[in-house]
A protein has these predicted regions:
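Secretory targeting and sorting signals
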Residues: 1-35, 83, 228
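C-terminal region of N-terminal signal peptides and the immediate post-cleavage residues
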Residues: 16-61
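N-terminal low-complexity, Ser/Thr- and acidic-residue-enriched intrinsically disordered segments
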Residues: 27-28, 40-44, 137-140, 169, ...
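Gly/Pro-rich cap/lid or specificity-loop segments adjacent to the active site
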Residues: 45-342, 398-400, 404-541
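Structural motif
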Residues: 330-344, 352-356, 386-394
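Short helix-capping/linker segments at secondary-structure and domain boundaries
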Residues: 351-369, 406-411
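Long, low-complexity segments enriched in small/aliphatic residues
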Residues: 369-413
Length: 541
């Protein structure tokens, strides 16, 4: 899935279907087996044994929490440590890697009951998604009013999954080349531009292999799920309480499939579609179509505030204003760094999070009035963040490419996305370029596991979804709900922010608290009215 910067309702405070993949366009994969989805039977048995070995070691060792690395710039109240996991679970005595973990201990005091003491319920482990997002800042969320009751009962635990940050980091290219700007972003690319992007995708895939070697094949979702079980053991938890957002819901669901008896409670916020036939090529086609709908929502909001922004009184007029800015930036980049690709990246964020709407509309309005400063500030590359961003993209690419078969014939990509771009031009081709290295991936592919639990196999789980989420289309929440027996789906109606847990919707948060604090869920499904739309911000006169 195409991933923007981490900004789920939880992560924000802290700071990706038309046709099936043709058989002729996919690489060979190892046969799956009941012993371990995505592997041969013998390897699956070895990986299950290796996970048990690693978890037993972690339980005996624990995590020695202490001061966090200075480079993380975390406050003193957060403590950090590491947990050791095998690079390859089929060989638990082979190469080991360390995952960085952060924690704030439960306060034990309920802020809504006069600081009345409350019992500790263990660790709440969070993953923000991506793949490639860092979870180290998650414990800071306990400072927010919406999270104080949860922070009273739970140790808030974040971590960097394998490949992220200091957790055996991946890299595929020189970070100094990562944030080059300005750059083009054609919505209907020429054949010459397509050939250029194919060449770049091949070079990027080669770079991943050259920089990581044989280790590259071990960065995938099944190993992320196994790592999570080792982390559970290292934290001293018999059963896991987990919240995943976006991609984090996918490997959380893999965990539930592989280790159902190790689950205490699980929250899936903004679920991706776990159907093995959709991981990940068809999921990205669905996502591009959903981005178009959410882009229309944003333009409709801007048009209703034409008196503030002057960008047009209809969505079509707002589109023309956007295209005018894009054409102008192609001819003369703003600040020497912001071209059409940087504009596109900034406005893609508006399809993830409503909070961006006033800022992006104001910046576009200001730019078209001859004042580019806000657009440069919001869309310009931040070179200080290049290394972190390059690392995030490398992990994203490795995990998605390793997880599943992808079409290996460029003609399949070209056919499907040319069709899609006729009706969904906003993000379709940029989504292609983000994922195209998977067509030329040098490492073996997994076969996606059949995420599924039967009645009574898994404790009840909570699924949260916004009805108009573009990054994780709502169909994914319905599919996740169908596959996890006993799960309950809470929908935020007529809303589209990507990730809704712990945000401004009190109805959603009440369901989240009731579940995590009391184990209480609605009988079947529940719906919450959507959050209020953002208020416009008037540009300077």
């Amino acid at each position: 899935m195409r991933a923007a910067a981490l900004h789920t309702a939880a992560g924000a405070l802290l700071l990706s279907t038309l046709t099936a993949v043709p058989a002729a366009g996919t690489p060979a994969v190892s046969p799956a087996s009941p012993a371990s989805p995505g592997t041969s039977a013998a390897t699956g048995i070895a990986e299950r044994h290796g996970t048990a070995v690693a978890a037993a070691r972690a339980a005996a060792t624990g995590i020695g929490f202490g001061a966090c690395p200075d480079a993380e710039d975390l406050p003193a109240g957060i403590r950090c440590g590491t947990v050791t996991v095998p690079l390859d679970y089929a060989h638990p005595d082979g190469r080991q890697i360390e995952l960085t973990v952060s924690r704030v201990e439960a306060t034990g005091k309920d802020p809504r009951a006069g600081e009345r003491p409350v019992p500790r319920q263990g660790a709440l482990v969070f993953n923000p998604g991506g793949p490639g997002g860092s979870g180290l800042y998650f414990p800071l969320i306990g400072l927010l009013p919406e999270w104080k009751r949860l922070g009273a009962a739970y140790d808030l635990v974040g971590y960097d999954a394998r490949g992220v940050g200091r957790s055996a980091p991946l890299s595929c290219e020189d970070p100094g080349h990562f944030f080059k700007g300005p750059a083009p972003a054609p919505t209907h690319p020429s054949e010459a531009y397509k050939r250029e992007r194919v060449a770049r995708a091949k070079a990027y895939a080669r770079g991943c292999a050259e920089r990581s070697g044989d280790a590259l094949r071990h960065y995938h979702s099944l190993n992320n799920a196994r790592d999570l079980d080792v982390l559970r053991a290292a934290l001293g938890e018999d059963r896991l309480t987990f919240m995943g957002a976006s991609y984090g819901t996918y490997f959380g669901a893999l965990y539930a499939t592989l280790f159902p008896s190790h689950v205490r409670r699980m929250v899936f916020d903004a679920p991706v579609d776990p159907d093995p036939e959709h991981i990940w090529y068809r999921d990205n086609l669905s996502q591009s179509a959903a981005f178009e709908a959410r882009w229309a929502d944003f333009r409709d909001w801007v048009a209703r505030h034409d008196d503030v922004y002057g960008l047009g009184a209809t969505p079509d007029e707002v589109q023309r204003s956007y295209e005018r800015a894009r054409d102008r930036l192609a001819a003369e980049p703003a600040g020497g760094t912001v071209g059409p690709a940087q504009l596109q990246g900034a406005f893609l964020q508006a399809t993830y999070y409503d909070d961006y709407w006033p800022h992006r509309a104001e910046a576009l309005s200001e730019y078209l009035r001859g004042r580019p400063e806000q657009l440069v500030a919001q869309a310009g590359p931040v070179r200080e963040a290049a290394a972190e961003a390059e690392n995030g993209r490398a992990v994203y690419t490795a995990v998605e490419c390793n997880d599943a078969p992808w079409p290996t014939d460029w003609r399949v990509w070209d056919r499907d996305n040319t069709r899609l771009a006729r009706v969904a031009p906003f993000e379709t081709w940029d989504n292609v370029w983000a994922n195209l290295p998977c067509a030329y991936w040098p490492a073996p592919r997994q076969r996606p596991a059949d995420v599924r639990t039967g009645p009574g196999e898994l404790p009840p789980t909570l699924i949260l979804a916004a009805e108009r989420d573009a990054a994780a289309p709502y169909q994914g929440a319905l599919e996740m709900h169908r596959r996890l027996a006993g799960s309950v789906l809470v929908t935020e109606r007529d809303a589209g922010t990507h990730g809704i847990a712990g945000g401004p919707n009190r109805c959603v948060d009440d369901h989240l608290e009731a579940y995590l604090l009391e184990g209480r869920l609605p009988v079947r499904r529940a719906a919450c009215a959507g959050r209020a739309e953002p208020e416009p911000r008037a540009p300077a006169k």
